[in-house]
UniProtKB/Swiss-Prot annotation:
Protein's recorded name: NADH-ubiquinone oxidoreductase chain 4
Subcellular location: Mitochondrion membrane
Organism the protein comes from: Dugong dugon
Family per similarity comment: Belongs to the complex I subunit 4 family.
Its job: Core subunit of the mitochondrial membrane respiratory chain NADH dehydrogenase (Complex I) that is believed to belong to the minimal assembly required for catalysis. Complex I functions in the transfer of electrons from NADH to the respiratory chain. The immediate electron acceptor for the enzyme is believed to be ubiquinone.
């Protein structure tokens, strides 16, 4: 694991020691090399996972998320270049340092063997994200968004520490490699039910569960492009990863406690998809669609079957790449139109035909068109939930209908129609932007050919 952590940490001195002209090229190329090195983690001959040391390990669940994390840093740097072009060099370097720190914390979160280390790193990701949103966001409302993000996440996750100490006292260990094989189970008392609730709440706020999702649209809309990308692609997946790790430890309790959250997720999935149909703000629409997709993942994790776990892992990776791609496309529109309102960006298909092709591909993956990896994840989850209860097909079917509706609404509003007058002086799409979109789409297409590498622990 150190072969990824050490080079990532060394990107920070590289940032500050690089000359201003070579800074972007240096860091982007080195971070690409790191992401290619991380692909070696896919070679796991044993089912038990690779135990590197007492602190870090990787298995079939954490490996895809680790690779997604390392893959996203060069893409964030490529997307941020125009946004930072007016800033001074010192500020550019501090921005890049924040992104590298965030990647470092995320790698250690996904690779942690001890739950306490996972908790510390889970909390540490809050600091760089908060700085990125409140310092480099576009509008003054970013301070409000940062506060929402901070308080929702902190209040959700502080009780988790107390719960972890309690589990340590009951089971005797918090090691993720040992704890699943421990014979002693947690007692089924009301206090343990409360502990289950505090454990899940920390991760459900991060997912986010419908009802405690209000920080997400604000944070997404106000964050700069790299902030939106990392929030949608990886920080939401922290919640899913934590839930998958902890529900296995709290096994007997999960079966009895999960019902209200399953109901809330199914309801929230339909509600947030309906909200998407009423959005005028492009980034807000993509943020609400993230809430809707993550509700599916919560349902899958709480059902606790091998199929649902496989579906949840596949959908998390697929959604990470798709939502990041949609935010990049929204940002490329924003840089030209200087507004997030969709109707102002209409008719772009005639002006930017190649960008319209990326839009079409992104929208088709978002609405889970066969044979994309998004469909494989959703299909697994729908089958697992249908075997759990037949009535879920009503929610799932309606949600798929709404997802297709709002995705096509987004595509038609931004691409079709008569171009507005101010669009005549618009810049053409840059090679940097086309490369950025291609680097999102190519992994999605490759994963559709070979999905088994991201189906997680149960495959």
């Amino acid at each position: 694991m150190l072969k990824i952590i050490m080079p990532t940490a060394m990107l920070i001195p590289l940032t500050w020691l690089s000359s201003n002209s070579t800074m972007w090229v240096n860091i982007t190329m080195h971070s690409f090399i790191i992401s290619l090195i991380s692909l070696s983690l896919l070679n796991q001959p044993l089912d038990t996972g690779l135990n590197f040391s007492l602190l870090f390990f990787s298995d079939h669940l954490s490996t895809p998320l680790l690779i997604l994390t390392t893959w996203l840093l060069p893409l964030m740097l490529m997307a941020s270049q125009h946004h930072l072009s007016q800033e001074s060099n010192t500020r550019k370097k501090s921005y890049i340092t924040m992104l590298i720190l965030l990647q470092l914390f995320l790698i250690m979160t996904f690779a942690a063997t001890e739950l306490i280390l996972l908790y510390i790193m889970f909390e540490a990701t809050l600091i760089p994200t908060m700085v990125i949103i409140t310092r480099w966001g576009n509008q003054p409302e970013r301070l409000n968004a940062g506060l929402y993000f901070l308080f929702y996440t902190l209040l959700g996750s502080i009780p988790l520490l107390i719960t972890l100490v309690s589990i340590q006292n009951t089971l005797g260990t918090l090691n993720l490699l040992i704890a699943p094989y421990w014979t002693q189970h947690l007692p089924d008392s009301w206090s343990m039910n409360l502990l289950w609730l505090t454990c899940m709440m920390a991760f459900m706020v991060k997912m986010p569960l419908y009802g405690i999702h209000l920080w997400l649209p604000k944070a997404h809309v106000e964050a700069p492009i790299a902030g939106s990308m990392v929030l949608a692609a990886i920080l939401l997946k922290l919640g899913g990863y934590g839930m998958m790790r902890i529900t296995i430890l709290l096994d007997p309790l999960t079966k009895s406690m999960a019902y209200p959250f399953l109901m809330l997720s199914l309801w929230g999935m339909v509600m947030t998809s309906s909200i998407c149909l009423r959005q005028t703000d492009l980034k807000s629409l993509i943020a609400y669609s993230s809430v809707s997709h993550m509700a599916l993942v919560i349902v899958a994790i709480l059902i606790q079957t091998p199929w649902s776990f496989m579906g949840a892992t596949a959908l998390m990776i697929a959604h990470g790449l798709t939502s990041s791609l949609l935010f990049c496309l929204a940002n490329s529109n924003y840089e030209r139109v200087h507004s997030r309102t969709m109707i102002l960006a209409r008719g772009l298909q005639t002006l930017l035909p190649l960008m319209a092709a990326w839009w079409l591909l992104a929208c088709l993956t978002n609405l889970a068109l066969p044979p994309t990896i998004n469909l494989i994840g959703e299909l697994f989850i729908i089958l697992a939930s249908f075997s759990w209860s037949n009535y879920t097909i009503l929610f799932m079917g309606f949600n798929m209908l709404l997802t297709a509706s709002y995705t096509l609404y987004m595509l038609i509003t931004t691409q079709r129609g008569k171009a507005s007058h101010h669009a005549k002086t618009m810049k053409p799409s840059f090679t940097r932007e086309n490369a950025l979109m291609a680097l999102h789409i190519i992994p999605l297409l490759l994963l559709s050919i070979n999905p088994k590498i991201i189906l997680g622990l149960m495959y």
